[in-house]
Amino acid sequence: IGAVVDRTSLDWDDPVEKWLPEFKGDAKGKILLRQLLSHTSGVRPYLPEPRVDNYNHLDSAIIEILPLDTVFTPGSRFQYGGLAMQIAGRMAEAAMGKEFETLFQELLAQPLEMKNSHFTPINTDGGHAPMLGGGLCTTLNDYIHFLSMIYHEGTYEGKRILTAETVKEMQANQVKDALVSPGEYTEIALGQSHTGIYGLGEWRELIDKKTGEAYQISSPGWAGAYPWINKRDSVYGFFIAHVVGSSAKEDGFSSFYGSPVISRTVSEIVK
């Protein structure tokens, strides 16, 4: 989505209704793109049960989201969830006139040489709408190219993929004055509380107390995927552990909340 912002008139402060007219007259129409990607939008975190998941495109996903009420005033609270990102993805599609998988391939995967990465794997069963929050199928080798680009402020192998301004915006505090309830990922995983826990699509794990800038960012997955970048230690990596069933094991270890142990261990080894 940042690549679309760089190339079109789509802006982080655009309301949903500017690009998706079906939201005009709906409370969700006034939500800003940056709120959708920072979990401060007020959109319900997930579809109610039983989830309707038999569509193949984001425009169909939007039809399921449109009737749902918001759960709080946009910008007033932080609540993690994936539905808002579906709306953001549809805004990007509207801005460039292409489906999300095509945008991903043309703007990121191809220039980053991510040859085995897709949001919509080829499958005759249907039901594979791009799930922006956790739906990327990739490999260690592919994803490390993406992390390298983010680490190098938007460049990869001498090619400009994202503007430095967009990368900075992604890593900036986007939660701002929104209420953060106790028990969020950063508090449980790191054993500390700080404001500005989230940017645009990424957690701000470790913060420089003097500047307020995040020097460690991440995007851990519930099933055991943990990509991170630590700018202070000049380290970035991607760890994958396949977890069957509950993320929390009988011995108390959680592949999700235990993720920062990996980044901390790697930094200690490198030092």
How would you name each of these model-derived features?
Residues 4-44, 48, 67-69, 90-132, ...:
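Active-site helix/loop module of the DD-peptidase/beta-lactamase fold
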Residues 77-80:
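Cytochrome P450
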Residues 116-141, 172-238:
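Active-site Gly/Thr loop motif
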Residues 179-183, 207, 246-271:
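Short, gly/Ser/Thr-rich active-site loops of penicillin-recognizing serine hydrolases
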